[in-house]
């Protein structure tokens, strides 16, 4: 499975790509590995295709020890959010950046276009709260990297 995830990029493609592609690439790759070949257009791999724009921002933490999370249900129920999850457990010690160990959460967002995706991203991003025992926010401010760079960055946050 790691080989499959590595070839797809390892960023929740099992959730984000089926509505974009109209099939499930993970299932196609596994089917091909098991049978020697797999046709992505085969009906058993087909899913409903959704028009619009998508984003899968990954969130990372600063150094510290995770004490608390907030906003899970609020973010999961936010219009346009297909999936959201915190990935670290309470008590996890975060060291200097080395690899994806600091990956703390992810979002899968869908909207009618990139302007709407950016709006949803900004509104949800500011509700993600990962703190240490002193209440210090551990989430790295990487929002600017997650926004569509082709758009003006003046979308309201509330």
Enumerate the language-model features and the residues they cover.
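Short intrinsically disordered coil segments
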Residues: 19, 71-77, 122-126
């Amino acid at each position: 499975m790691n080989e499959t995830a590595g070839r797809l990029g390892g960023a929740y493609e099992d959730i984000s790509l089926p509505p974009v592609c109209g099939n499930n690439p993970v299932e196609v790759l596994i089917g091909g590995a098991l049978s020697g070949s797999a046709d992505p257009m085969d009906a058993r791999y087909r899913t409903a295709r959704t028009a619009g724009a998508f984003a899968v921002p990954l969130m990372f933490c600063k150094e510290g020890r995770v004490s608390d999370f907030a906003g899970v249900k609020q973010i999961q129920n936010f219009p346009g959010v297909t999936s959201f999850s915190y990935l670290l457990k309470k008590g996890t010690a975060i060291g200097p950046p080395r690899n994806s160990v600091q990956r703390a959460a992810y979002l899968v967002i869908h909207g009618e276009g990139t302007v709407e995706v950016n709006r949803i991203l900004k509104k949800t991003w500011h509700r993600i709260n990962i703190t240490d025992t002193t209440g210090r926010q551990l989430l790295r401010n990487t929002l600017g990297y997650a926004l569509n760079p082709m758009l003006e960055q003046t979308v309201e946050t509330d």
